[in-house]
């Protein structure tokens, strides 16, 4: 699934003006978090690693509730190291009522060219644990955190990193080992479809730079795709709209199926 609504999409450089006279965070809109605790990080660190809005949390809660009532509560939870993805994964999984530990997979992080100025300063595992997030210390990720941004990454390298990370996660969840939730980015949802759909068995579908432009429109906040592994042949079956969509006035988290189900990377 894609993460929920992010603060900077609505409020721009919120971290620069949401301050009180002491330089501490101050809520200036009711869709902003009342406070940023229990995380204790400088506001400037949110510049390239933003948080969820209040409604972003609500969207994640709705998806988690849908997983619960549809019998798809996760047994394992993976997420990108971006804070908004960590928050989304934690909130959605909490709503299902099952115990869980977050497995942070740096290989799921979005394309580097969205960060031309500098690498985001991610919240560390120690900071997350201190803030109450239940992190799986025993998880060995496909991609190490220090390897992110270590080299310039082409679009082909980006596709391979994310799809290989998804395959790594799938390999850890053998048939009969339960349901997996992956919370990451809009492009991750698209790359998951291109990796696991049966029509791409011989060669995964690539997501092109053209596809990545404005991908947040066809893959909106908290949208998701669901695949089920067939026990007889170990292949994946796509379940269209396995979870009910979320619709409110001019917003819906429903995927643009013409985009997500396109046959090749060239189609928009």
Description of each model-found segment:
Residues 1, 105-107, 239-241:
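Conserved beta-strand termini and adjacent loop/short-helix elements that scaffold enzyme active sites
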Residues 1, 78, 176-188, 192:
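Beta-strand elements within well-structured catalytic alpha/beta cores of enzymes
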Residues 1-100, 104, 159, 219:
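Active-site-proximal alpha-helix that buttresses catalytic centers in soluble enzyme cores
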Residues 3, 84, 185, 245-251:
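Histidine-centered active-site/metal-ligand motif
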Residues 41-51, 132-156:
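Short glycine/proline- and acidic residue-enriched helix-loop micro-motifs
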Residues 62-69, 164-172:
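A generic secondary-structure signal
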